[in-house]
Amino acid sequence: MSRTGMPVINFINFNQTGTCISMGTSEGLKIFNCDPFGRFYSDEDGGCGIVEMLFSTSLLAVVGIGDNPSMSPRRLRILNTKRHSVICEVTFPTTILAVKMNRSRLVVLLQEQIYIYDINSMRLLYTIETSSNPRGLISMSPSLENNYLAYPSPPKVINSGIKSNANTNNIGISARSSIAEGGSEYLDKGTEPLTDSSKAGADLNSVKASTETTISPGKEHSAGSGLNATSSSGTVKNGDVIFFNLQTLQPTMVIEAHKGEIAALALSKDGTLLATASEKGTIIRVFSVETCTKVYQFRRGTYPTRIYSLNFSDDNEFLAASSSNKTVHIFKLGKPNAENSSAAATNSDDDEGEADSDDGADDDGVGDSDDTRSTVSIESFDNGSHQTREPIVDSSRKTVGRMIRKSSQNLSRKAAKALGSYFPKKVTSILEPRRHFASLKIPIESGSNLKTICTIGEPLTLDISDYPELFSGSRTMAQSASISANSSDSSLTRNSNFVKMIPIRVVSSEGYMYNYVLDPERGGDCLLLSQYPLLMD
């Protein structure tokens, strides 16, 4: 229990579609529906450290925190919430750091191993030996058409009498030798074979609740085997990411995403794009899974910060990033073209080491944090056409710092635009890198260690008359009609009382869900519609 007498939140996440929230606390687990908001399942059998959903089905993957023997952090339990029963249990050699699922595969991440299962039979298909991954970073595509796994792979230091300071970036490791090493590690750990192979291959729904198996390695694959992980410069690259095909059970490519260690990574819902952020948190990069090339690069802000989550919209139009400064930045991707790909590819990793200029909407400590609902400034609505409308400005976040920063950035952009006509595209892309399209700031003052997870929902239509305090000001019906008539592809519909928005949902480690909306055409500040407590009964 916390000091306030409330349960401690150990884990919180959205499901694959962003429509449900799974939460593990010191007392048990809870499952919530996002829209309409409400709790529809809870269990208080013991503290939970991981609670993952399979879309919106009744299947849950649960890992305990060790407060009682049945809730060991090394034991994975597959639950059926409709029947309130345990389908099966699997015990691993070390603590489970992450569990990911789609409709064909279940992946379990330990600190130095990844286990891949057929989710329909819980049969162990593959074991991957990886470099140490204490943060439990891993991403799995929900799509079966592009069934990929992405995980960081910093170099492993090798005790070599042939080459000093050897690691997996500067020495080649054959698949045979790496598998042999992996096998010897398992022998040292004393891992036993499956206690009942017939149960391991049985259908998931037919396994009895009391079934418990102890894993043994199936096929093994070292993080460096079969891949060209050697750096051309001979320097150690800590920001490597491996793509692994979960259908063919083969690694496909290693990409050098960043110079520093990876802090966050996420595959898009269709499995075609990968977003990454390093420990510094100032640069967000997006890669094509098919070509393994960098297609977008964004600057989040000036000062280093920890990126906690990355999330793509369903159509890959937007990318959201939540960070330790209680902000969420939304970047607009659009459709990648040759110019975007060229500009992203020419931006070197050295950009991340430079002093980045912030876009002014948000950075560490920027913006007011009051508990009142946000209101849209009248300045953000004009009578002009869709092409000239300014981004939405949240009046509750107007500060002197933001005004000064906005003025300086406008001057910087004008200078970059003027100089850009005299320089090649490579130099222009460095002078004027892409910034965030919209942002929001969680309305709390405390919580320096606040962690947030964000997701982008499907577009919705709002009746502005339902939110008079949100869309306040002297915006008349005539103004609305004028804007609507002049914007054939705008976010406003033909009916001036309605506006098309994109929901941005954020959950925090303090136990709240925040519902924001984003104007997909104008961007700017996201508007807070509602917030709900997750720990209250």
Swiss-Prot record:
Ranges of compositional bias, category Polar residues: 207-216, 374-386
Segments of skewed composition (Basic and acidic residues): 387-397
Region feature Disordered, mapped onto this chain: 184-230, 338-411
Subunit structure: Component of the PI(3,5)P2 regulatory complex.
A GO biological process held by the record: positive regulation of vacuole organization
Classification via SUPFAM superfamilies: WD40 repeat-like
Keywords: Autophagy, Endosome, Membrane, Protein transport, Repeat, Transport, Vacuole, WD repeat
GO CC terms in record: cytosol; endosome membrane; fungal-type vacuole membrane; PAS complex; phagophore; phagophore assembly site membrane
Family, similarity comment: Belongs to the WD repeat PROPPIN family.
Membrane topology classification: Peripheral membrane protein
Protein purpose: The PI(3,5)P2 regulatory complex regulates both the synthesis and turnover of phosphatidylinositol 3,5-bisphosphate (PtdIns(3,5)P2). Necessary for proper vacuole morphology. Plays an important role in osmotically-induced vacuole fragmentation. Required for cytoplasm to vacuole transport (Cvt) vesicle formation, pexophagy and starvation-induced autophagy. Involved in correct ATG9 trafficking to the pre-autophagosomal structure. Might also be involved in premeiotic DNA replication.
Species of provenance: Eremothecium gossypii (strain ATCC 10895 / CBS 109.51 / FGSC 9923 / NRRL Y-1056) (Yeast)
Protein name in UniProt: Autophagy-related protein 18
Pfam family, one: PROPPIN
Subcellular localization, as worded in the UniProt entry: Preautophagosomal structure membrane; Vacuole membrane; Endosome membrane
WD repeats: 257-297, 302-341
Composition skew (Acidic residues), residue ranges: 348-369
